[in-house]
Design a protein with these regions (language model features):
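Catalytic cores of glycan-processing enzymes that make or break glycosidic bonds
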Residues: 198, 235, 362
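Beta-propeller domains
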Residues: 191, 202, 216, 220-224, ...
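Short, contiguous pre-domain boundary segments
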Residues: 1-2, 328
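HKD-type phospholipase D/PLD-like phosphodiesterase module
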Residues: 2-25, 33-206, 210, 240-283, ...
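Long, C-terminal catalytic modules of enzymes
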Residues: 283-285, 290-364
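Helical hairpin unit composed of two closely spaced alpha helices linked by a short loop
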Residues: 229-230, 235
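Short phosphate-engaging motifs
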Residues: 12, 158, 223, 312-313
Length: 364
């Protein structure tokens, strides 16, 4: 098994583009958002030109509702640039289908609240039952501009599990499973058994001896409660979030929970960070597509990777955590009217998500 940590969208794309071009049998890509801007066009052209006999692109239907972090059926629709981007996206979908690339929008939108919020947040690519990509990067210009990362893993065994996962999602029947491959624990959450699926992460937090370091823009309840519980045991807890958070209520919630729970908050100064990772005692790395938030905990389809692979943990610490920490500044962690209001808003959202959660399914 060969594992590479790819930091930044360009580093990720350079590797994935080559793997996609070299695929001969299967080329599967799953993403939360796909937009017809320059980044989306790059992916579309690469999939169109790929030699693989079975090429498929699976996009969550979130992309039919949101573009560039703006709601399409709303005031933003008056923006000519947004309308053009939506039309370009539709045009690329038609082109790809015309060139023999399967394109599907998963989890169709519907009028019920469950049909609106139940999304697949996975970011996955699998090529020739050999190479797997997992992580947090979506295919749009603004996502590529964010600070983020992906894993590239060469492993036929992991690729077999990832292919199984992709095909199940493609058929509208996402699976939940927990697999161990070469020191990587690969957990797939299907939006039904998520609380059970997250249990290994919660147990690891509860077993922490001296440190838990989290990078997430959208960290929220109940994970903030788990971190506060660890802090009460004397574990040092640090949360690194972006200086420019595109979801302000979540930033306020993090500050309020930190003020109450006694953990440290630091701000990444380089714009928006979309990183999502946790290290426990600098020995265990948890990463994937989950933001460690209430939507992941209750509703979203996600991937979680847990590993004690020393080379990978060190690569993450050396390439992400340590440099980001060195450039970050400590936030003044204190409760205020603003942080309390943000905290209330997030907790109301978490309660709503809990009520909308589907019955627990099988988790194996």
């Amino acid at each position: 098994m060969k594992i590479d940590l790819l930091v930044g969208a360009e580093e990720f794309w350079a590797r994935m583009r080559d793997d996609l071009a070299g695929a001969r049998d299967t080329a599967y890509v799953q993403t939360f958002t796909f937009e017809g801007d320059r980044v989306g066009a790059r992916l579309a052209r690469a999939m169109r030109d790929a030699a693989a006999s079975d090429r498929r692109l699976l996009v969550d239907s979130y992309s039919r509702l949101y573009h560039s972090d703006r709601i399409i059926p709303g005031p933003a629709w008056r923006d000519r640039a947004l309308r053009r981007e939506v039309k370009l996206t539709e045009r690329w979908v038609r082109r790809l289908r015309g060139e023999g690339v399967g394109v599907r929008f998963g989890n169709p939108l519907g009028p019920s609240p469950v049909r609106l919020v139940r999304r697949s947040h996975k970011k996955l690519a699998v090529f020739d039952d050999r190479v797997v990509y997992l992580g947090g990067i979506n295919f749009s210009e603004h996502n590529f501009a964010w600070h983020d990362m992906m894993l590239r893993v060469e492993s036929p065994e992991l690729a077999a599990h990832a292919t199984e996962d992709f095909r199940a999602s493609w058929n509208g029947r996402p699976e939940a499973f927990d697999r161990e491959v070469g020191g990587l624990r690969f957990i797939s959450l299907n939006g039904r058994g998520n609380r059970a699926g997250f249990q290994p992460v919660i147990e690891a937090i509860d077993a922490a001896c001296y440190s838990i370091d989290v990078v997430s823009a959208y960290l929220s309840h109940p994970f903030t409660d788990f971190l506060a519980r660890a802090r009460r045991r004397g574990v040092r807890v640090r949360v690194l979030m972006p200086g420019e958070n595109n979801k302000s209520n979540l930033a306020r919630h993090i500050l309020e929970r930190a003020a109450r729970g006694g953990f440290e908050v630091l701000r990444y100064p380089g714009g928006m960070s979309h990183m999502k990772a946790m290290t426990i005692d600098e020995e265990l790395l948890v990463m994937g597509s989950s933001n460690f938030d209430f939507m992941s905990y209750h509703i979203l389809e996600e991937h979680v990777v847990m590993t004690r692979n020393r080379a990978l943990v060190d690569a993450y610490l050396d390439r992400v955590w340590k440099p980001d920490l060195a450039s970050a500044h400590a936030d003044a962690v204190r409760s205020s009217i603003g942080t309390r209001l943000g905290d209330v808003a997030v907790r109301v959202g978490a309660a709503f998500a809990s009520r909308l959660a589907l019955p627990q399914g099988d988790f194996s």
